[in-house]
């Protein structure tokens, strides 16, 4: 079981989210976010740095606007799941309240009654290395996010991640869309979840004690 902060607007959501460690923060803490280091994150959490507003970036707006249609497609393609969606609710670990997150949806598998998480990602494929990040795996920063959500509550037994990959063909001037689904089982990653929890406990200590953590260079 875990605690839920029930919120119905974006302003309150941003306020409560900033007080803890969210899903997108996990990769920064482990040095797996190519765009932000753990030190950048610490400076934001301690008020030394204003987080960059990325809400008006085209890729961010696309991902936000695409989420609901992709969620509805998932519901059509996977009728074996009950899908629950609360856009602003913040889910918090019962004992470690700073470990928190807002899910793209919660799932219940009808046959087994197991609880899970649904996560949605959109990504542009611009070069061959971008394909490799999605080949039989998910990118490291998204994997850290899934582990973080597993850390919120051990009752979440799986995560279904839906990825829509967009590729521009310069020769034909056409867009190709590739949809991938990944099923991640909690029990397959127990050591990774425990490791992440310990690292987030350490990072939270640096925040609470206003101590600068050692820099972890992001993996590019």
Describe the residue ranges of each PLM region.
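Short, glycine/acidic-rich beta->alpha junctions
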Residues: 66, 97-100, 138-145
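Amphipathic alpha-helical segments that form well-ordered structural scaffolds
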Residues: 69-77, 148, 152
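Conserved catalytic cores of phosphodiester-cleaving nucleases, focusing on short active-site segments
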Residues: 74, 103-130, 149
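A short acidic/basic microdomain associated with nuclease active sites
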Residues: 75-97, 104
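Short, mixed charged/polar active-site loops
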Residues: 98-100, 113-117, 176-181
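Metal-dependent nuclease catalytic regions and adjoining charged, substrate-binding loops involved
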Residues: 130-143, 148-220
């Amino acid at each position: 079981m875990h605690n839920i902060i029930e919120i119905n607007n974006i302003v309150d959501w941003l306020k409560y989210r900033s007080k803890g460690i969210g899903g997108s923060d996990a990769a920064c803490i482990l040095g797996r976010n190519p765009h932000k280091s753990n030190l950048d994150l610490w400076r934001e959490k301690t008020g030394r740095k204003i987080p960059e507003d990325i809400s008006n970036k085209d890729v961010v707006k696309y991902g936000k606007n695409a989420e609901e249609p992709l969620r509805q497609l998932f519901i059509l393609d996977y009728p074996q799941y009950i899908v629950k969606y609360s856009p602003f609710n913040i889910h918090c670990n019962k004992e470690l309240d700073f470990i928190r997150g807002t899910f793209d949806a919660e799932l219940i598998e009808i046959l087994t009654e197991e609880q899970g998480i649904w996560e949605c990602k959109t990504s542009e494929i611009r070069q061959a290395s971008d394909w490799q990040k999605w080949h039989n795996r998910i990118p490291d920063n998204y994997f850290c996010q899934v582990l973080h959500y597993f850390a919120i509550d051990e009752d979440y037994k799986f995560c279904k991640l839906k990825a829509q990959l967009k590729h521009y063909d310069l020769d034909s001037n056409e867009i190709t869309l590739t949809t991938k689904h990944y099923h991640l089982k909690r029990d397959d990653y127990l050591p990774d979840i425990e490791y992440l929890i310990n690292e987030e406990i350490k990072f939270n200590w640096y925040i609470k004690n206003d101590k600068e953590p050692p820099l972890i260079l992001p993996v590019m």
